[in-house]
Amino acid sequence: MGRPRAKFNARTMRKWIAEGRGQGHGQDYLSWLKVQNVPSQGYVHRIMGWKTKRRHEFMSNNEAGYFHLLEWSPFVTDVREQFPLLPLDETIAIAKDHGIKHPTDPRTRYPIVMTTDFLVDVQRNGSTVQYARTVKPAKDLCSERVLEKFEIERRYWVRRGVDWAVVSDCDLPVELIKNIQWVHQYRDVDGKLSIGSTDVEKAERIMAELIRQGVPPAKSASTCDDRLGLAPGTGLALVRHFLATRRWSVDMSKLINPQKPIALSA
């Protein structure tokens, strides 16, 4: 949960609710906090979502990494980041009932609307199940104040029957995330590559054959570009596209180095 950069008060809250923040689903969802609203250490991310077709905003590398894992999961159908715990009166009451100081803006002393980093819709056995997840560095998990705020958040979601948990950087598979990040923007190549469907199929055959012979993806891609007269970089973009769409299958838990051979599954 981030603290707003600008002063937060009742007027700010009413304005943001009127703007539709924290409301909607999929492409129509607006996050409660935007990167310009929260003090940054330079690690903000804006990422176009595969599933939602909208731009997501994240306040840290860990949040962005966790988002890429959600993107890769075939069971996740919607991701709502910086989801507000409204109504504000409810978190205030939870805090009071359990002797916890509710977060406030130190400049206005007005209670801050708390947020959960991710509210995730997952398909399970034909129905949609929601999970609430908060991302936090492991080094911060020993802070008594952090744990107090977690308790408010946890109890908010318990009331709604939603599974809530904390995800730390220790829970994030680094190599898998790096691989997803490498292919992510190439899932949809329409408008990015000047190549027809026939040449895409030819390129796939050429590169798959070379890669299965042990030729690294980068070399296979440049060879393909030369053979088909494609613009430099087209072949490697297609390699990333085939992986992003799962048209090609590899062990994504092992870091992909395009300069080294990879094993394509049959």
Predicted segments, located by residue:
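Electrostatic, structured charged patches in enzyme active sites and in nucleic-acid/phosphate-binding
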Residues: 1-266
